[in-house]
Amino acid sequence: MHATTVKNKIMQRDNYKEIMSVIVVVLLLTLTLIAIFSAIDQQGISEMGRMARDLTHFIINSLQD
């Protein structure tokens, strides 16, 4: 009886850790998306397009070296 109780408590703790890990990942992804969209909004679409173009040229030039 005691071993079953201990086993159940360990399983509950593992489930709690797993649920908390999922919650943390979801929160971090949400904050990342908010930061990205906020940056896009502040810079404007044309500015983001210019930055993407510059980054693409940089990557292509780096690969050619």
Swiss-Prot record:
Q: What is the name of this protein?
A: Two-component-system connector protein SafA
- Membrane association type: Single-pass type II membrane protein
Q: Enumerate the InterPro entries for this protein.
A: SafA
Keywords carried by this UniProt record: Cell inner membrane, Cell membrane, Membrane, Signal-anchor, Stress response, Transmembrane, Transmembrane helix
What this protein is reported to do is described as: Connects the signal transduction between the two-component systems EvgS/EvgA and PhoQ/PhoP, by directly interacting with PhoQ and thus activating the PhoQ/PhoP system, in response to acid stress conditions.
Q: Where, in residue ranges, is this chain on the Cytoplasmic side?
A: 1-18
Compartment(s): Cell inner membrane
Q: Where are the transmembrane segments?
A: 19-39
Q: Which GO terms describe its cellular component?
A: plasma membrane
How the protein assembles, per its UniProt entry?
A: Interacts with PhoQ.
- Taking the first listed entry, what is the main subcellular location of this protein, grouped into a coarse class? membrane
